[in-house]
Amino acid sequence: MSEECTHDCSNCGAACSSRNAAPQHDAPNPNSSVKKVIGVVSGKGGVGKSMTSALLACAMARRGYHCGILDADITGPSIPKLFGIHGRAMADDKGCWPIQSRMGIDVMSINLLVENEEDPVVWRGPVIAGAVKQFWTDVVWKDVDFLFVDMPPGTGDVPLTVFQSLPVDGIVVVASPQELVSMIVAKAVNMAEMMKVPMLGIVENMSYIVCPDCGKHINVFGDSHVDEVAAKHHLPVLAKCPIDPQLAALSDAGMIETSGGQFLEGAADACEKLLK
């Protein structure tokens, strides 16, 4: 890179070695219309990323937006289970159609395409990444205001494919309170920065549990380190969600849309600002 580079590519010639080419995303299905794409990521598994994706879509749907969820976790899909969806996605000459939840949220997942939802998907990375890409190019996302992409944990093939192929407008990182989270979140944040994808902020899940007798907040996993991690990366903490046994029961029953929790309103506000 030239020492005189100003990083303003609009003022330099096409032959400039430091010039950043505009990202070339894959075109969506011709019948699709998606306003904003939000990636929901985590550095490790088991932090409640899929539940966060589902609750965030529900929160935006309650605000009157038409939402969709692209389940990019091909080998560990859980979105259909959370919404109680067990049907098979249908296709016609226009493309493959997602299945709508009770609230009208469009859902596409590998579990809606396989014969038996308990069958494992034993595919190598490039095939999995290709399937995720097809969920964007072949599926009809019709009149969707917010498409949430529930990504598998880590920084492997699928997140790379999503960042390169989809016009991601923002990323929400889901984390847990443990000190180890600082390194894990840093990996996710650094990948987003490398791919030049905007970060909306961090959601801390399993932040605490509320004592049913006295209402005291108990930090099951010890003191939270998310605030300092967020400050280090100049990111807002969008929400701190408790361990909620009732929410867990609703999720297991496929009734997550009936949850009345308002824990993700801050994250919903951050998403809504993208339209303004």
Briefly describe each language-model feature range.
Residues 108, 132, 151, 164, ...:
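Glycine-rich phosphate-binding loops of nucleotide-dependent enzymes
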Residues 66-67, 72-117, 122, 129:
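Phosphate-binding loop that captures ATP/GTP phosphates
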